[in-house]
Amino acid sequence: MTELPDNTRWQLWIVAFGFFMQSLDTTIVNTALPSMAKSLGESPLHMHMVVVSYVLTVAVMLPASGWLADKIGVRNIFFAAIVLFTLGSLFCALSGTLNQLVLARVLQGVGGAMMVPVGRLTVMKIVPRAQYMAAMTFVTLPGQIGPLLGPALGGVLVEYASWHWIFLINIPVGIVGAMATFMLMPNYIIETRRFDLPGFLLLAIGMAVLTLALDGSKSMGISPWTLAGLAAGGAAAILLYLFHAKKNSGALFSLRLFRTPTFSLGLLGSFAGRIGSGMLPFMTPVFLQIGLGFSPFHAGLMMIPMVLGSMGMKRIVVQIVNRFGYRRVLVATTLGLALVSLLFMSVALLGWYYLLPLVLLLQGMVNSARFSSMNTLTLKDLPDTLASSGNSLLSMIMQLSMSIGVTIAGMLLGMFGQQHIGIDSSATHHVFMYTWLCMAVIIALPAIIFARVPNDTQQNMVISRRKRSL
């Protein structure tokens, strides 16, 4: 890093800043949801749409971000990403209704979807290959700090100011970041293949409509027949994409990806696995505040051990997988995460609050080992010619499954809690207990998929992707 020119180091700082903004926003909002609900006159049971709208938008827009950067230029797209994210933050702070807030989060999600992948692409273009790993480590470090600061910072802002400030703080830093991007970042443009617009639209419609159908009856009052029509339309869009990809060699995601067994199995497991684990960051701060009566700041502090556990486990997960293999690690961590989530609920309802940080630390460790293993299992055997496409599809599936997870969590809360629940009451405890029991079952189910992973304790066990050919 020290051998790089000053202008390149400044460009890396800009990318790191973008990573920090995006990662901070993924965790800072969850702590503020109960306060948002009170301010907007909504039930806390409906506030999951604030999270779903952002994550689903990121999932939909991810496939287009790399192509746009190549076609229009990395500086132009990164600048646009920061501007859209900042404008979305402003509109979030100005929102007076839940629907306005959801629409503003969609705009924020468009910017967030482009920020991280375009940032990675920028590093690839400005840094010599020999220093790429060091540069990526540098720019992703702020992205790891964001989730650590987010819950506590969100709690402080909500408790001592108002929830609007979790969005307003993005505005000055966004302005500085946009100006620095425009002045300092080069605008690399390369020849690229034609964008698969029909495939992109089919996938986008399918993902959005299916998620809406899953949640529409509770939060939007859509009739069952309309929901059935939406579900059928979403499924039809996905099936049409598969037909399109089979006939079109330039499809957004080639079906040749699924000729690699570990990719197919890993992608299915990642999708199912992240539905369950995607519920936890949303449900935990909501339960601590609504179910147990914690203050926003206290609830935010309680999330820090989970992030620390996740960061610490990343240092040893390679050795664990090398020792036990993917199948054993994935099955054990999947079942372990379900048990730890039940342990968290039990400890909380028994009033043993002093044990909650330890349980959340353990939850973060187990979840991190599971995430790392799922990601590398999915990509490790792909041919080099399909590696980039496979990684993009995995990133999209990760965001989609997390949005579905939050949607299901909100749906479960609504089903058990009907319309309104009080803070720290016996009835509220029962609502969260039933919801958590269902969540534990959903978290555990992907173990059935991971049990089909080949026994790899003697081969293909290192978390790295070797060179492959078609």
UniProtKB/Swiss-Prot annotation:
It is a multi-pass membrane protein. InterPro entries: MFS, MFS_dom, MFS_trans_sf, Multi-R_MdtD. The chain crosses the membrane at residues 12-32, 49-69, 77-97, 102-124, 138-158, 165-185, 197-217, 225-245, 263-283, 286-306, 342-362, 396-416, 431-451. Keywords: Cell inner membrane, Cell membrane, Membrane, Transmembrane, Transmembrane helix, Transport. It is found in: Cell inner membrane. GO terms for molecular function: transmembrane transporter activity. GO terms for biological process: transmembrane transport. Residues 33-48, 98-101, 159-164, 218-224, 284-285, 363-395, 452-470 are cytoplasmic. GO terms for cellular component: plasma membrane. Disulfide bonds: none annotated. It holds the Pfam family MFS_1. Residues 1-11, 70-76, 125-137, 186-196, 246-262, 307-341, 417-430 are periplasmic. Belongs to the major facilitator superfamily. TCR/Tet family. This is Putative multidrug resistance protein MdtD. The gene is mdtD.
